[in-house]
Amino acid sequence: MQDFWHAASAQLESELTPQQFKTWIKPLTPLSFDEQACTLRIAAPNRFKLDWVKSQFSGRIQSLACDYWEATVDVQFVLDPSAGQRQAALQPALAPVPMQPLGAQAGQPRQAMPAGNGVSHDAATLRPAPSVYRETALATASHAAADIDVPVMDAAEVSARSYRMPPQAPAVVATLAAPPQAHVDDSVHERSRLNQILTFDNFVTGKANQLARAAAIQVANNPGKSYNPLYLYGGVGLGKTHLIHAIGNFMLMENPRARIRYIHAEQYVSDVVKAYQRKAFDDFKRYYHSLDLLLIDDIQFFSGKNRTQEEFFYAFEALIANRAQVIITSDTYPKEITGIDDRLISRFDSGLTVAIEPPELEMRVAILMKKAQAENVTVPEEVAFFVAKHLRSNVRELEGALRKILAYSNFHGKEITIEVTREALKDLLTVQNRQISVENIQKTCADFYNIKVADMYSKKRPANIARPRQIAMYLAKELTQKSLPEIGELFGGRDHTTVLHAVRKIADERTKDAQLNHELHVLEQTLKG
């Protein structure tokens, strides 16, 4: 039996993502194999994992068992007999804990979002700027800052402006070179408007955001030298802002004199208006054109703001020419933003464009556990799975749910259990359960790909029908709580292995095919309203 489980685990590990294998397969324990009855019993550590493994992986495990023993094997999944003892041992740790604002460290107040800053990335390449520029900048920056939301630069910052030669862009790396542990003064974060809390260390990575994180790490290590601009897009609360703050914080740790500015697009529009009203636009342009890193959030707010777009275009051109890094976020793909000048759209497309997708189940669980850990609160794993299974859209929704659970537990003096969680989130869960159905997914995909809804259930296999059907199966798996057999039944009584094949095929191709990824993003946004 142990030989079988070793071989089966190795096979499943090769088929699943590392996070899926670690979450679902590794915790399983083979209990016994009855040769006469040809029955294999496998234990799961808790009820949630038991139910999920039975619905998602039982067919594959049974297939492996039948191949191994060359017979029809009945695989039975049961709750680990020792699970109750472990749960009892954990009870003292699950007592309610006084609430803190989510995101604050124990014993520390929540940090406010800071404000704009100063100079170059690579100290070895620094050389003084011309004195005329230095004197003019110092004389005018103070005046500008009084009326416009632009920080003042001191003489050392201005004179340290770097001029970089254009190097060849290196390939994406998935590791982050550790910056020297330089002390970064709070005033630097204040001027840059970087949130010190948002770093790579506390960014939870999964299949949905791994490419975006890899690109962000590459840019942090090689600002202005690789992907420029870096354009991150995705729905609300998926981590775009976290990633760009992480890049800025990494650069500041590496060089506290780096001239960095994080700004929301709406604030940039406001600053442009103020600059014209105060007749201080030369100062405004001088500041923005001299940055080493510009992080601009939610660029879609430039829509219809023609004057702002024109000024941003010139700032963008100046920064790129100086090999300064530009990072942009938006809620949609560049070419889908309405009311933006074609010149800007083409500039956004000239760098690297990366989508951040809604987090998958395992990633949502990891996010919840990490947020709870930051609050010094113990949340049982099965509770995290319960919440993650029902709330699928974004990280902020998960954070909000965790706040409600902690508040409910604290106010009522109850331990955090699935029953308490269900009661705390009853309104939210009711709304979620009304949302996306497989039938709605089928209709949306049929309309999108111009086929009949009936084709979703038919046995027809032409590529123009089979492909949309596979995409609909993938979305049904990602966006609903249906099991593979249930999805198969709703697609004309297909076997769960057919659904599994479609899900894996589309998930794999999505990471390689930009057009498919874009189509899926549009469908997901449409279904979520």
UniProtKB/Swiss-Prot annotation:
InterPro entries: AAA+_ATPase (IPR003593), Chromosome_initiator_DnaA (IPR001957), Chromosome_initiator_DnaA-like (IPR020591), Chromosome_initiator_DnaA_CS (IPR018312), DnaA_C (IPR013159), DnaA_dom (IPR013317), DnaA_N_dom (IPR024633), DnaA_N_sf (IPR038454). Residues 193-409 are annotated as: Domain III, AAA+ region. Residues 72-192 are annotated as: Domain II. Plays an essential role in the initiation and regulation of chromosomal replication. ATP-DnaA binds to the origin of replication (oriC) to initiate formation of the DNA replication initiation complex once per cell cycle. Binds the DnaA box (a 9 base pair repeat at the origin) and separates the double-stranded (ds)DNA. Forms a right-handed helical filament on oriC DNA; dsDNA binds to the exterior of the filament while single-stranded (ss)DNA is stabiized in the filament's interior. One of its GO terms (cellular component) is cytoplasm. Residues 410-529 are annotated as: Domain IV, binds dsDNA. One of its GO terms (biological process) is regulation of DNA replication. Pfam families: Bac_DnaA, Bac_DnaA_C, DnaA_N. It comes from Ralstonia pickettii (strain 12J). This is Chromosomal replication initiator protein DnaA. Belongs to the DnaA family.
